[in-house]
Amino acid sequence: TFVAIKPDGVQRGLCGEVMKFIQPMKQHYLDLKDMPFYAGLCKYMSSGPVFAMVWEGEGIVKMMLGETNPADSKPGSIRGDFCINIGRNIIHGSDTVENAKMEVALWFKPEEFVTYTEKAKAWVYE
């Protein structure tokens, strides 16, 4: 696909900002670079805006997202309710705590987070 940053983007000095969007996506999926679907995945993930978030909760995030393959996801999960194809499963979730730390660091700066103490946590988790 031919991509051009239009004159208004160039004049506004946004070329670097546009490239900042594309580079993290390739780095995010770097562990899959030897897979046959890597190029298509990078193209798909760079084809439009993404809404990046950080969620937390002991064991709940994976349950809310559902399985990578929507066909294996339970009703009531995001993928179980809204997806039918593994290649277009609408949402990404880190598969391990270690990967989550790397992915969060790739997409967010430390100053973008709010530090808070969740008072109910002591009453929910042991």
Curated annotation (Swiss-Prot):
<dbReference type="GO" id="GO:0005634">
    <property type="term" value="C:nucleus"/>
</dbReference>
<dbReference type="InterPro" id="IPR034907">
    <property type="entry name" value="NDK-like_dom"/>
</dbReference>
<feature type="binding site">
    <location>
        <position position="68"/>
    </location>
    <ligand>
        <name>ATP</name>
    </ligand>
</feature>
<dbReference type="GO" id="GO:0005737">
    <property type="term" value="C:cytoplasm"/>
</dbReference>
<keyword id="KW-0131">Cell cycle</keyword>
<keyword id="KW-0067">ATP-binding</keyword>
<dbReference type="GO" id="GO:0046872">
    <property type="term" value="F:metal ion binding"/>
</dbReference>
<keyword id="KW-0963">Cytoplasm</keyword>
<feature type="binding site">
    <location>
        <position position="37"/>
    </location>
    <ligand>
        <name>ATP</name>
    </ligand>
</feature>
<dbReference type="Pfam" id="PF00334">
    <property type="entry name" value="NDK"/>
</dbReference>
<protein>
    <recommendedName>
        <fullName>Nucleoside diphosphate kinase B</fullName>
        <ecNumber>2.7.4.6</ecNumber>
    </recommendedName>
</protein>
<dbReference type="GO" id="GO:0006241">
    <property type="term" value="P:CTP biosynthetic process"/>
</dbReference>
<dbReference type="InterPro" id="IPR036850">
    <property type="entry name" value="NDK-like_dom_sf"/>
</dbReference>
<dbReference type="GO" id="GO:0030027">
    <property type="term" value="C:lamellipodium"/>
</dbReference>
<dbReference type="GO" id="GO:0001726">
    <property type="term" value="C:ruffle"/>
</dbReference>
<dbReference type="GO" id="GO:0006183">
    <property type="term" value="P:GTP biosynthetic process"/>
</dbReference>
<keyword id="KW-0966">Cell projection</keyword>
<keyword id="KW-0479">Metal-binding</keyword>
<keyword id="KW-0539">Nucleus</keyword>
<dbReference type="GO" id="GO:0006228">
    <property type="term" value="P:UTP biosynthetic process"/>
</dbReference>
<feature type="binding site">
    <location>
        <position position="89"/>
    </location>
    <ligand>
        <name>ATP</name>
    </ligand>
</feature>
<keyword id="KW-0546">Nucleotide metabolism</keyword>
<keyword id="KW-0597">Phosphoprotein</keyword>
<dbReference type="InterPro" id="IPR001564">
    <property type="entry name" value="Nucleoside_diP_kinase"/>
</dbReference>
<keyword id="KW-0808">Transferase</keyword>
<keyword id="KW-0547">Nucleotide-binding</keyword>
<comment type="similarity">
    <text>Belongs to the NDK family.</text>
</comment>
<feature type="binding site">
    <location>
        <position position="6"/>
    </location>
    <ligand>
        <name>ATP</name>
    </ligand>
</feature>
<keyword id="KW-0460">Magnesium</keyword>
<comment type="function">
    <text>Major role in the synthesis of nucleoside triphosphates other than ATP.</text>
</comment>
<dbReference type="GO" id="GO:0004550">
    <property type="term" value="F:nucleoside diphosphate kinase activity"/>
</dbReference>
<dbReference type="GO" id="GO:0005524">
    <property type="term" value="F:ATP binding"/>
</dbReference>
<feature type="active site" description="Pros-phosphohistidine intermediate">
    <location>
        <position position="92"/>
    </location>
</feature>
<keyword id="KW-0418">Kinase</keyword>
<feature type="binding site">
    <location>
        <position position="79"/>
    </location>
    <ligand>
        <name>ATP</name>
    </ligand>
</feature>
